[in-house]
């Protein structure tokens, strides 16, 4: 059976022909369970992002050397990002060689070890080493979870299910603020805040023991019987046969490519360069528009706005985190109904407005030199609006797009590389925010972020295609057409023998 791309399982043409085979978000309990289990990796990511913002307030109280050094504060925050950067870079290879399941189990072990080290840290420097371990686990998980969910999901609901991972990230941030608030009056405040983070890692490790490997990874590793058993838990018999035929066609195409894939290969093919530019660019702009500045330092920002109480700062930050989680729920719906590109653009326009409000409020606050007051509350409003606009769009879109724009053979490596770009960008922002705010002023810092958001709008318009509802094969065709023009016949499995020639053509571009 030969499948052309318009009739591939899950494509719009296929689902128009067989509407009874269309699946819904809640149509398969197995897929939901897999999504939530894999998404705990996102919860670890989110919890670590949020918990350090509150813990830092109390770490400064326990260690005078930390209180006296903005650089040391930034290092405690950003060392997890250094670990995540390394973990994400290695995570692509771990995913492709050992599989998505083993990569997740490895991430859980490393994260739990880091949580124990942080909770027991006798000084800031041991604490920093624990942050590095936690970051390694988060980095591997950030690569693995979106790809694992995407490869197990029907294409018609893939965007929403991958976005569930982002919901878990924002849910983890909200949970961290709840935990922060719960331990404010408990001896050893920050140790409890940081130590509790190991619990979700242990839970995910146990649950993942009962989860299968990605069916697409199994199929490409020639473990077809196992892959079919996994697919049978998702699809009924009629669509199952079509999905198997589609994977067989994809496998034949993969055989025409080089069996050993290296990082430099990504830059030798024009179509892969274009895909990586779009994916990595989205990841970079997600960070440089300031989201983790807000999440890492929101209690500190609230205190900068004139609200000096630790408890009040944490409470207002808890509201911001709750809005972030709620906004992500909205994004899960819209990402498969409005599309990735429109959602990202509307999100960025709102982010620009919010950052301008934050900038104006801090400029005025510095002129009046009063605590709290009108401009303090205006800053809190700006934070809230920022989250309202960012969470549904630029929160889930970069991770969703990166889980679906790369060919199977390159998905692990490209996903790892783009996630590394995210973590490097995250590190730069986290390590410099307080320093820039001290040197240039908080108002100017947010104005710079607004300017970067304007550049992000231009980037999305020019470089990011719409991938809503497309199969992996259809997405690949977009990059081939952008790289080489609209070549007649692309998309038929009978043309797979031409792949090697085109990749060689791309390497000379």
Swiss-Prot record:
Function: Vacuolar inositol-proton symporter involved in the release of myo-inositol from vacuoles. Not involved in glucose or fructose transport.
Family annotation (Pfam families): Sugar_tr
Any one GO BP annotation for this protein: myo-inositol transport
InterPro entries associated with the record: MFS_dom (IPR020846), MFS_sugar_transport-like (IPR005828), MFS_trans_sf (IPR036259), Myo-inositol_Transporter (IPR050814), Sugar/inositol_transpt (IPR003663), Sugar_transporter_CS (IPR005829)
Annotated family: Belongs to the major facilitator superfamily. Sugar transporter (TC 2.A.1.1) family.
Transmembrane segments: 39-59, 74-94, 109-129, 132-152, 159-179, 192-212, 274-294, 315-335, 343-363, 374-394, 423-443, 444-464
Phenotypic consequence of gene deletion: Reduced root length at low concentrations of myo-inositol.
Annotated source species: Arabidopsis thaliana (Mouse-ear cress)
GO cellular component, one term: plant-type vacuole membrane
Location in or out of the cell: Vacuole membrane
GO molecular function, a single term: myo-inositol:proton symporter activity
Recorded topology in the membrane: Multi-pass membrane protein
Record motif Di-Leu, residues: 502-503
Notes on the domains: The C-terminal domain (465-509) is necessary and sufficient for vacuole membrane targeting. The di-Leu motif is required for this sorting.
Protein name in UniProt: Inositol transporter 1
Sorted UniProt keywords: Membrane, Symport, Transmembrane, Transmembrane helix, Transport, Vacuole
């Amino acid at each position: 059976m030969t499948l052309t791309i318009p009739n591939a399982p899950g494509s719009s043409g296929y689902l128009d022909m067989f509407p009874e085979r269309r699946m819904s978000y809640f149509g398969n309990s197995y897929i939901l369970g897999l999504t939530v289990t894999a998404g705990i990796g996102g919860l670890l990511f989110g919890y670590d992002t949020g918990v350090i913002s509150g813990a830092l307030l109390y770490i400064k109280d326990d260690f005078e050397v930390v209180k006296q050094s903005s650089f040391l504060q930034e290092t405690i925050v950003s060392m997890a990002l250094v670990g995540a950067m390394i973990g994400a870079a290695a995570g692509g290879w771990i995913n492709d060689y050992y599989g998505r399941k083993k990569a997740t189990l490895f991430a859980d072990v490393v994260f739990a070890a880091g949580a124990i080290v942080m909770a027991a840290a006798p000084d800031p420097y041991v604490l920093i080493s624990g942050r590095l371990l936690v970051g390694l686990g988060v980095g591997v998980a950030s690569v693995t979870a979106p790809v694992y969910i995407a490869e197990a999901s029907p294409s018609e609901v893939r965007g929403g299910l991958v976005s569930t991972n982002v919901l878990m990230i924002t849910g983890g941030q909200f949970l961290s603020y709840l935990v922060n608030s719960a331990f404010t009056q408990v001896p050893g405040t920050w140790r409890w805040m940081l130590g509790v983070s190991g619990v979700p890692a242990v839970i995910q490790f146990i649950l993942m023991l009962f989860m299968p490997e990605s069916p697409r990874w199994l199929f490409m590793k020639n473990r077809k019987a196992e892959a079919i058993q996994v697919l049978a838990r998702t699809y009924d018999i009629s669509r199952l046969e079509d999905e198997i035929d589609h994977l067989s066609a994809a496998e034949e195409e993969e055989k025409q490519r080089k069996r050993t894939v290296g990082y430099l290969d990504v830059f030798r093919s024009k179509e892969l360069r274009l895909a990586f530019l779009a994916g990595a660019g989205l990841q970079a702009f997600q960070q440089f528009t300031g989201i983790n500045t807000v999440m890492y330092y929101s209690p500190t920002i609230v205190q900068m706005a004139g609200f000096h109480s630790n408890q009040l700062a944490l409470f207002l930050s808890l509201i911001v985190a709750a809005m972030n989680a709620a906004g992500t729920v909205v994004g899960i719906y819209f990402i498969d109904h409005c599309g990735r590109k429109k959602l990202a653009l509307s999100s960025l326009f709102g982010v620009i407005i919010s950052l301008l409000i934050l900038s104006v409020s801090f400029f005025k606050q510095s002129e009046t030199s009063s605590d709290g007051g009108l401009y303090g509350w205006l800053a809190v409003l700006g934070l809230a609006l920022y989250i309202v606009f960012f969470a549904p769009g630029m929160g889930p879109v970069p991770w969703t797009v990166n889980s679906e724009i790369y060919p199977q053979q390159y998905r692990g490596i490209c996903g790892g590389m783009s996630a590394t770009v995210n973590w490097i960008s995250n590190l730069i922002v986290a390590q410099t925010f307080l320093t820039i705010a001290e040197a240039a002023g908080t108002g100017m810092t947010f104005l710079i972020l607004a300017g970067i958001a304007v550049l992000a709008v231009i980037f999305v318009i020019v470089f990011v295609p719409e991938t809503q509802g497309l199969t992996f094969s259809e997405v690949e065709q977009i990059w081939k057409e952008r790289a080489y023009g609209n070549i007649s016949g692309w998309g038929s499995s009978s043309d797979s023998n031409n792949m090697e020639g085109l990749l060689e053509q791309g390497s000379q571009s």
